[in-house]
Swiss-Prot record:
Pathway: Quinol/quinone metabolism; 1,4-dihydroxy-2-naphthoate biosynthesis; 1,4-dihydroxy-2-naphthoate from chorismate: step 4/7; Quinol/quinone metabolism; menaquinone biosynthesis. InterPro entries: Enolase-like_C_sf, Enolase-like_N, Enolase_C-like, Mandelate_racemase_C, OSB_synthase_MenC1, OSBS_N. It is an enzyme of class 4 (lyase). It comes from Pasteurella multocida (strain Pm70). Keywords: Lyase, Magnesium, Menaquinone biosynthesis, Metal-binding. The active site is at K142 (proton donor), K248 (proton acceptor). It catalyses: (1R,6R)-6-hydroxy-2-succinyl-cyclohexa-2,4-diene-1-carboxylate = 2-succinylbenzoate + H2O. Its cofactor is a divalent metal cation. One of its GO terms (biological process) is menaquinone biosynthetic process. This is o-succinylbenzoate synthase. Gene3D superfamilies: Enolase-like C-terminal domain (3.20.20.120), Enolase-like, N-terminal domain (3.30.390.10).
Length: 337
């Protein structure tokens, strides 16, 4: 029996919060692709959204590659086996793998929508959401954008004020060893255990590990997970100071690749945290479903929707942002030859 395969591709461009800075660049809008795949009566959606300054591929490159893959996929009837995703750009592999998994019923419906509230610098933003939070209290703070001693003081102040709070901190490799030490100096030793982890404090993994050994502050890998050295030998990076790896599927690749990383981390007793690359609500809800399916006991890092002015196609359960659909001026179908 011949299967009928079809696809549609759309491009979205949504205004975002004007304060959003990615590696010293203001991001005015978030752009990406929405893909729909259909096979007979089954269908699935995915999002392909390279993150400027972080992804290796541009949106144009991703669009070209996705179109070529989808055209080959739709022209085949599946008898020649699966079309591989591994050679594709990470954002393309992830978006296509989500669409295919949805279509085949392999991506579970239930999602983990508990978020770690994200703070870009003003700690007052965190008190209300944290005091209202049920269950485990986890918040995330971006550090490394201001003075290291200020970052240390803010972290210490929050831990002092909310005794059952655990913090995730993200430095994006921005500190020298001496600046990282300056941060630690302002966090009281009795509070350091409640820093769940500090992502990539220093410019190199070796410096970050040394910082963790000297201060007792646990660290997590984020950028390192995508480095060639890590991919060749992950266990080398799973030392006692490392408490988590952060997996951003848009930057890592297909669902299958992400699951491999999760299993490697769990085998070494290390948390795997599914995290956002500032996807639209469509991509974020799929990340929440992935998190529930593969890391059910870990709060994912998905608190980025409020940076956007709109939700796209599928709503995040608790969001009050307006929802746009395929008729919106912000979504354009990509014409197929």
């Amino acid at each position: 029996m011949t299967m009928i395969r079809k696809f549609k591709l759309y491009q979205y461009s949504i205004p975002v919060d004007s304060q959003l800075i990615l590696r010293n660049r203001f991001l005015k809008k978030r752009e990406g692709l929405l893909v729909q795949v259909c096979c007979d009566d089954a269908q699935g959606w995915g999002e392909i959204a390279p993150l400027p300054e972080f992804s290796q591929e541009t949106l144009e490159q991703a669009r070209e590659q996705a179109l070529a893959w989808l055209e080959e996929w739709s022209a085949s009837d599946g008898s020649a086996g699966k079309l591989p995703l591994e050679h594709l750009f990470p954002s393309v592999a992830f978006g296509l793998s989500c669409a295919l998994a949805e279509m085949k019923g392999l991506l579970h419906e239930e999602g983990n929508y508990q978020v770690a509230p994200l703070c870009y610098g003003d700690p007052d933003e965190l008190y209300d959401p944290l005091n209202q939070m049920q269950g485990e209290k986890v918040a995330k703070i971006k550090v490394g954008m201001y003075e290291a001693n200020r970052d240390g003081l803010i972290a210490d102040m929050l831990l002092e004020a909310i005794p059952d709070l655990h913090l995730r901190l993200d430095a994006n490799r921005s500190w020298t060893p001496s600046k990282a030490q300056m941060f630690a100096k302002y966090v009281k030793p009795e509070h350091r255990a409640r820093i769940q982890f500090l992502e990539e404090p220093c410019k190199t993994p070796a410096e970050s590990l040394q910082f963790a050994e000297e201060t007792g502050i646990a660290i997590a890998w984020d950028e390192t997970v995508r480095d060639a050295e890590f991919q060749q030998n992950p266990p080398h990076f799973f030392t006692p100071q490392v408490k988590a790896i952060v997996i951003k599927p848009t930057l890592v690749g297909s669902i299958q690749r992400c699951v491999e990383l999760i299993k490697q981390a769990h085998a070494h007793g290390i948390q795997a945290v599914i995290s956002s690359s500032i996807e639209s609500s469509l991509g974020l809800t799929q990340l929440a479903r992935l998190a529930q399916q593969y890391t059910p006991n870990t709060v994912p890092g998905l608190d980025t929707l409020d940076l956007m002015d709109y939700q796209v196609i599928r709503p995040w359960p608790s969001s009050t942002l307006p929802l746009i659909d395929l008729d919106s001026e912000y979504i354009v179908p990509i014409k197929l030859d």
